[in-house]
Structure formats: structure tokens, C-alpha cells
Amino acid sequence: MSPSFAIVFIFVCLFVFFGLVVFIGAPYVPSHKKDVKRAFDHFGLGDLDTLVDIGSGDGIILRIASRYGARSIGYEINPILVGISRLLSRRDARVTILLQNAWTANLPQSTTIVYAFAVNRDESKLVSILQQAANRLQKPLKLLCYGSPFKHISAADTFEAYHLYIFQPLQPKNA
């Protein structure tokens, strides 16, 4: 294999894994540790929580949540980022990283809070998934979004660029 072919192949793979993912979810944007820690302090993340990160990237949110005592589960569709995240989190028993599309996954029963990088185009999808999960699990679920506030529902709390939404389970129609 020629060196130029190898370079082109690497760039094509990187484009596929990083570029095309944007059409399915948010782009990979690394989170700043100090901002995440301040947000977790503000919103009171702790050892009774299970945080699910939709689009967990390199796993920094998961590892910080674990330091707060929370169990953390990350869904990521980019296999390169899953590998990096698993490597960086390998010694942390409270961190789980799944190579899976979060849009098609069922949130675990233990979920208390979902973390997402907010992209306005995904608002209705996120709201629908969280409401369905709250109904299925029959408990309130929190959604902590970094970035743009939602346009169609109000945040229960806001801290800097973080917006907290709470989804209450709706009563079944036959109840």
C-alpha cells in the first residue's frame, strides 16, 4: 500500500466517523472540565444519580460524573471516540460506554439524569425520548443540556450555558 493511499484512506475514515455523524447527532465538541464541575455542583449531581450521556464523545462528562459518585453511562456512535473513551475510563467501574445510537436505546431503569449537547434541530426528538422514558420508567427524569435553550419548553433551572428540564411521568390513558 502506498503512503499516499494510506493518508487518503485515513482522511476518508476520519470524515466518515466525525463528519457524517453530524447528520445523526450533534458534532463532537469537547466539554471544559471546570464548566462541567460548576454545573454538577450547581445542579447537585451525587452518588444517588445515574447519568446517561447522549453522544458521550471522549467520555469526559462520564468521568467527572463518576468523581461525584454517580454511575455514568455513555452512548456514542463514533467507534474512534468509543475506543478513546473506554481507554481513558478503563479503571473506573462506575463508567460504561456503549457503541450505540442513543436515539434507539432504552434508558436504563436507574437513570436519573440525561446529559446532552443541545442542538435546536434535536429539541423535539430529545423531548419525545425523555417524556417516553419518564412514562415507561414511571419516575421523573432530568435532562441537562449544554448550549441552546429549548424553544418550546421552559427550563426548570439555568446555570450559565446549562439548562435543566424535568420530565414528569404522564398517567396512562386507561388509568
What residue ranges belong to the model's regions?
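S-adenosyl-L-methionine
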Residues: M1-G46
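Conserved class I S-adenosyl-L-methionine
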Residues: D47-G57
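Conserved SAM-binding loop of SAM-dependent methyltransferases across substrates and taxa
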Residues: D58-A70
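Conserved SAM-binding motif I beta-strand of class I
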Residues: R71-E76
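Conserved beta-strand signature within the Rossmann-like core of class I S-adenosyl-L-methionine
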Residues: Q138-P149
